[in-house]
Amino acid sequence: MQAILALDQGTTSSRAIVYDAHGGVLGTAQQDFPQYFPQPGWVEHDPGEIWQSQYRVMIQAVERAGIPWSAIAGLGLTNQRETTLLWDRATGEPLHRAIVWQDRRTARLCDDLRRDGHERLFRERTGLLLDPYFSGTKLRWLLDHVPGARRRAEAGELAFGTVDSWLIWQLTGGRLHLTDASNASRTLLCNIHSGDWDPDLLAALDIPAALLPEIIDSSGVCGTTCCAGVPEGIPIAGVAGDQQAALYGQGCHEAGLAKCTYGTGAFLLMHTGERPIASANRLLTTVAWRIGGRTAYALEGSVFIAGAVVQWLRDGLGLIRSSDEIEALARQVPDTGGVYLVPAFAGLGAPHWDPDARGILVGMTRGTERPHIARAALESMAFQATEVIGAMEVDAGLAVKELRVDGGASANDLLMQFQADLLGAPVLRPADTEATAAGAAALAARAVGLNGARPSAEAAFTAFSPRLSRYEVEQRMATWQRAVRRAGGWARDDD
């Protein structure tokens, strides 16, 4: 027997899944780990906790699969993107907690870069916006605020990486400092047209090139394992950012196919072929993957808060005891009773890109009860996704005829039905909603010749067809957009 081990390092948990040569699941493991919030708008991880949680589930998944390590033909890796780490090349010790993609501490730096006339440079070469979401300004903050970091970086003593780089470093015993093209494209430092680190971008952010990892293909053996507890020599054969991995895992291998992953945030990608499409609607142009030196591109819209709004109802408000309860609670009412929740807890992502927006709950009366708020929270995910898809359709010049979905919240039938209603198009949910891990496994399987483990565009789906009239949808969207306008700019210091 031959198998693929997929590592899926996310924002709130690490997981590992072992797939057989036909794509069937043999064993899984998952472990949560904490986020830290040292100041309002700041979000951090402990790099050691990232690695230790990923290491533990890797071991557990293989044990639960009931196969020897010698059966693992390759390892695929996918990860939360943009989260930024800085560590000592000699010791492997981090210099600071990882700054998470949700973190907004560099909003003013982004303002300064725009004011200095750099926005066009970054937009044209990276396909991204000058926003705190991306890695480049986070790395600049670390260099400016960690004592001695800039001097040591210029001396070549430090390594920068996104989470894929950190895990590859750990898996190879510090022998390899790499990142794949999809992760590199999320840093504000990579020219997506040439596929290389861009000297002008580095200069604009004052970042030494000595910090940077080598950029590699998303599918291909880049090294082998060399860490305690894991046999040496297992090929590391696939690496991609989580949303690009999900696009691949959903079988969206042709231009015009789109998917939405509902995780902590919601992430929508549309494959656009082998040429990047510049967005006129504040979407991101990004690398989908690079295989055999050929780059596929995508349009992307990122919603910062999706499933995290359910966590907030559970942990912040105590409205539910577990996330699984929300659908049953929301079904107790036929609608939200006019309540709208805009979960701009960390600003708004695409297509608004407003770091100063903040969450609001509007439309409440004395008749508003827990189920109305629960339903408004679920509907907020669908409203945000619909805004992004509308912008994609304009940029790409075509209509999304169906949306493929995955991620934890895609198991919620109420949410998926409302998403189909708003889109006016079918929503297709695969039997296996772990498309992120499946994509990483498929990229690795491709590299080691296990083609049976690769995803099919014709996989079995559960379909949700639209039911609401277009008039009702237009009314609901208009009210949602009015609520969004009220949330906009709330934290801005207008004085």
From Swiss-Prot:
Pathway(s) the chain acts in: Polyol metabolism; glycerol degradation via glycerol kinase pathway; sn-glycerol 3-phosphate from glycerol: step 1/1
Enzyme class: transferase
Disulfide bonds: none
One GO biological process term: glycerol catabolic process
Claim: Aminoacyl-tRNA synthetase is one of the keywords in the record: no
Residues given in the record as ATP binding sites: 11-13, 264, 307, 311, 408
The enzyme's E.C. designation: 2.7.1.30
Function: Key enzyme in the regulation of glycerol uptake and metabolism. Catalyzes the phosphorylation of glycerol to yield sn-glycerol 3-phosphate.
Name of the protein described by the UniProt record: Glycerol kinase
